[in-house]
Amino acid sequence: MSAPAAELAQTLDLRLLGRTDYEATVQAMQAFTSGRDAGTRDELWICEHAPHFTQGLAGKSDHLLNPGDIPVVATNRGGQVTYHGPGQVVAYPLLDLQRLGYFVKEYVFRIEDAVIRTLEHFGITGHRVEGAPGIYVRLDDPRSHAMLAQRPQLRVPGSPAPQPDFSGLGKIAALGIKVSRHCTYHGVALNAAMDLEPYERINPCGYAGLQTVDLSTIGVQTTWDEAARVLGRQLQRRLAP
């Protein structure tokens, strides 16, 4: 890697945008990504959105149980249906993975690690679940460090992935990404202090009965601004080469 490229790879410019329109933000991410060149600095956009459901590329209409008056927006990220609304910290890393020197699987791992470290800042233990991207917490003891039986583990090569098991867990962060010409957009949403009722109108991420939580329901009192700053710092650190 040349010296200028190495310097760019170390830089992730943070933009705290506040409340933004979802569709306009997606269009802006697409324009940023399509207009990139070798000298474009990576950016991290953090915002929140008005209430709406988004359907990913794999989305199925039967996971929309009763959207009611909340708009449903088709989008080009990976994954199934999820909900965005006030009190949720949405982070969009706009990265050149080729320049950073890692692949999509590691990128996902690094995003999840940033969320886990963010939760740790608030005294909460985040967990991964085999076969289900995102971060989860124990409903009975969100601060417990005990490992989950459902955690990702080494499998015999060629063996099928197990069906995700969400017993005793609540989902606190959802992940949905898009990679175009080795450049990323879309990202991760961390629930801070939300109205969680809209999640009852869908099968979150395509899983019937999956419980969704936020920081406030598990005993953490914080503001959107604080949660956004902590997540932003962690993503800046964890996404560096």
From Swiss-Prot:
Q: Name one GO molecular function term.
A: lipoyl(octanoyl) transferase activity
**Protein's GO biological process:** protein modification process
Job description of the protein: Catalyzes the transfer of endogenously produced octanoic acid from octanoyl-acyl-carrier-protein onto the lipoyl domains of lipoate-dependent enzymes. Lipoyl-ACP can also act as a substrate although octanoyl-ACP is likely to be the physiological substrate.
Q: Which pathway is recorded for this entry?
A: Protein modification; protein lipoylation via endogenous pathway; protein N(6)-(lipoyl)lysine from octanoyl-[acyl-carrier-protein]: step 1/2
Source domain of life? Bacteria
Q: What is its EC number?
A: 2.3.1.181
Q: Is the keyword Lipid metabolism in the record?
A: no
Q: Which UniProt keywords apply?
A: Acyltransferase, Cytoplasm, Transferase
Q: Further remark, if any?
A: In the reaction, the free carboxyl group of octanoic acid is attached via an amide linkage to the epsilon-amino group of a specific lysine residue of lipoyl domains of lipoate-dependent enzymes.
In this chain the BPL/LPL catalytic domain maps to 38-241
The entry's localization annotation reads: Cytoplasm
Q: Which NCBIfam families does UniProt cross-reference here?
A: lipB
Q: Which Pfam families match?
A: LplA-B_cat
Q: Where is this site: Lowers pKa of active site Cys?
A: 171
Tell me what this protein is called: Octanoyltransferase
The family note in this entry says: Belongs to the LipB family.
**Which reactions fall under this protein's catalytic activity?**
octanoyl-[ACP] + L-lysyl-[protein] = N(6)-octanoyl-L-lysyl-[protein] + holo-[ACP] + H(+)
Positions bound to substrate = 77-84, 174-176, 187-189
> Which PROSITE patterns does this chain map to?
BPL_LPL_CATALYTIC (PS51733), LIPB (PS01313)
InterPro entries (alphabetical): aa-tRNA-synth_II/BPL/LPL, BPL_LPL_catalytic, Octanoyltransferase, Octanoyltransferase_CS
- Give the UniProt entry's GO cellular component terms: cytoplasm
| Active-site residues, as the UniProt record annotates them | 205 (acyl-thioester intermediate)
